[in-house]
Swiss-Prot record:
It is found in: Cytoplasm; Cell membrane; Apical cell membrane; Basolateral cell membrane. The active site is at 778 (proton acceptor). The gene is DSTYK. One of its GO terms (cellular component) is apical plasma membrane. Belongs to the protein kinase superfamily. Ser/Thr protein kinase family. The lineage of its organism: Eukaryota, Metazoa, Chordata, Craniata, Vertebrata. This is Dual serine/threonine and tyrosine protein kinase. Widely expressed with the highest expression in brain and ovary. InterPro entries: Dual_SerThr-Tyr_Kinase, Kinase-like_dom_sf, Prot_kinase_dom, Protein_kinase_ATP_BS, Ser/Thr_kinase_AS. SUPFAM superfamilies: Protein kinase-like (PK-like) (SSF56112).
Amino acid sequence: MEGEGAPSWRGGPGGLIRELCRSFGHYNRHLARLQHNLRETKKFFRDVKYSQGNLFASGAAIGEGSPSGAGGGGTRDGGQNFISFPRHEEEHLQQTVSWHPCLLILGQNCNAKCQLLNILLGEKLLPTTKISSEENCKRRRIRFTHGTQTRVSLALPEQYELVHMMAAHRGHWDTIPEEDLEIRGDSEDPAHRIAELEVVLPYSLLKEVDVVVAPCRGFQSAEATLEEYMNQVLLIVIFAISEAELSSSDENELREIKEKFSLPIFFFKVPESGVELISPKKTDNEKSSLYCQLMDLEYLSTNHCSCGAPSPDAVAQSMLVEQLEKLRLLSTFSRQVLQKHLVEAATSLNEVHCRCLNIFINQAFDMQRDLQITPKRLEYTRRKENELYESLMNIANRKQEEMKDMIIETLSNMKEELLEDAANMEFKDIIIPENGEPVSSKDIKCCIKQIQELIISRLNQAVANKLISSVDYLRESFVGTLERCLKSLEESWEVSVHPARSLEKSKDVSVHITSNYLKQILNAAYHVEVTFHSGSTVTRMLWEQIKQIIQRITWVSPPAITSDWKRKVAQDAIESLSASKLAKSICSQFRTRLNSSHEAFAASLRQLEDGHSGRLEKTEDLWLKVRKDHAPRLARLSLESRSLQDVLLHGKPKLGRELGRGQYGVVYLCDSWGGHFPCALKSVVPPDEKHWNDLALEFHYMRSLQSHERLVDLHGSVIDYGYGGGSSIAVLLIMERLHRDLYTGLKAGLELETRLQIALDVVEGIRYLHSQGLVHRDIKLKNVLLDKKNRAKITDLGFCKPEAMMSGSIVGTPIHMAPELFTGKYDNSVDVYAFGILFWYICSGHVKLPEAFERCASKDHLWNNVRRGVRPERLPVFDEECWQLMEACWDGDSSQRPLLGIVQPMLQGIMDRLCKSSSEHPNKGLDDST
């Protein structure tokens, strides 16, 4: 029977076995929760991948930016590729949570290992009388596992049993026969040599953990044994020592283990046989040789005692136990090793949750922005194009005379230069005799044509430059902005139609343009500079009449092609040009081109608008899916993984006296937890899935925020699965504890300067939340806590959400709720409204309800009055500037409420003025400062 026949000491092995069972049972329970969370996480990512087809992939890449958001960390590179469980992380976590614990006993020699095994199991199962050296010993590996019946067999590791007659099979045994432990030297069967001895026993400890006694060094080194087990089980390594000192081979073995595996090891000095099992206690100043050797090997350090007491941070460290009665520390050591493993796994899983949850939130911002800004961009594009069209038509209608003058001026300024260039011109593809004899009429026509082309090209460039400068302002005021806006619309539409192309846009800009035809029209009709400089179709049409006019000139064959002849041809061509006709032709064709471009643009824009209409419907569906399904579901998994991490590191908090009750939970005093003292513990029992989701998201937002002096710190969370006797599940939120809330402070009486400082603190806290993209939605007296110096901190982020994650639900405390909250469409200005009401209480100095609200018989009556514009009354003690600030903050039109960046300096000015005035005139109140 377990526990009988073992070496005895004070307390016996039963206590050690019970403690070890508790440690491994604790591990297995938490491992089961971690495995469940991992299964749900994998299922979540599968559901996200296949939900609504490719809708999520197309929606993930929209938008051009996101606010900092709760938690930060955006995704700008395709989105959907990151909303996934990376394969390497999934495989690593799956492997980690599938490991079962195993106690591996190493040692100086077989006797030490066997003696330790016998002590642990409370039975003399292995013989301890072997006298051969460890290097010459040939004992095989021994594995002890749980079963209902005692059984001994040879088995290949993780494979099958060998059919082999063993000494233990011949009859009853208490100690396993020596010959079954040995590897026979004459055995020719390789399977027999590598097989391990498997011992099945009905012991309670073996239900929780397998125990393996390593083979002797003569058969397999400790390093090789560890190599086999490292990626299969969770090892708790024990090193049994029977001698007063480690031998050189022991030191070398331990040194190699440390270099290769960096494992913490529990070193135990087994008692000498036949000697009193209770070793004499050493004083703190006495350090054994073993301790010094392990210090030199860097297994032990001076920051924890030689007795093996656990370190304060509960990180697994090697221990040395030289007294049998302290073997119970093996339970502490095992718990630390197991805890470290669980914490690392829970942390890795929570990092996956938080990373993807932050991406979801940032994408919700992107989608919300897309829904808001796309219709405005379409309207802006239509309006600006129309303004551009009308402006260019006005130029064509009103500036014909200016164009005529411009052409005359250009010709006049360029005439000499043109004539000189024509005289020096070298003709192409025409052979001119050196003696200047006349050439054929065909060659003469070619010469004339080349001179015409020279004049046309030079005049084209000069007039184009003049025309560009005349409409230069249009390029900046219309075309540039219009093009950027249109490009953004086209890109977002293209991504929705062809999601895969969004990844290629950095390589090929043309790929993501949805309407190349529309772009060509804009380039031809509106980009005046590009059109004239590039010699496009418009340019050729504008100057076609120039060619026709020049070609109608009658030429007399010259006696020879000389410089004078070329100059004469050029001069006649220039003089034959009509500036008025050219100007009229330019304006006429310009108007024609503008009309056709305008009509084509309008048609293309309607097509683009239709495409965006369908895309925005899908985006809104996806936005709802993210807000109401994906993000809350992932947030709950994140809450569970983080709570598991917290309970492993810091344990379950102890509830003190009740401090107060709220709508969704009870607040208790908690003396200390996780190194924080004192704490407040909020116990919340979510009644349904919606409240679970809200709580999980609240927790994520609070944990994502950096510590801020105007917000109450959240230290951690623990999920109590046995709350109320196991009838329900409670979430315990451990927070910073402060002195009192503002409601209690006002009832007790606070000085004016203190109250105004509290108002400044509240504004600073709300501003920080808004800077992180969060809206509190429940600013009130009870949610402002005061420390012992009466400095304020905002608490209870139960209704706090990023704007993009708000569903329009009606939340908050009635008297602090802005009118637009009842419509379901609101933004962070609801916090400004609530602050206005809070400021009324701060300035009044009491907690009595405003008369207008006190007369209301019900919440519905109160809400109706607020919607109709009823607000708190002005009290006689109010300063004029304070009253104006209140009225501005609770304005019924949310767009007219001041930004908190404006409110804060106003409050500071009020405080400086009133408090300085009060110090000079102690009896002066708020009403005297108007």
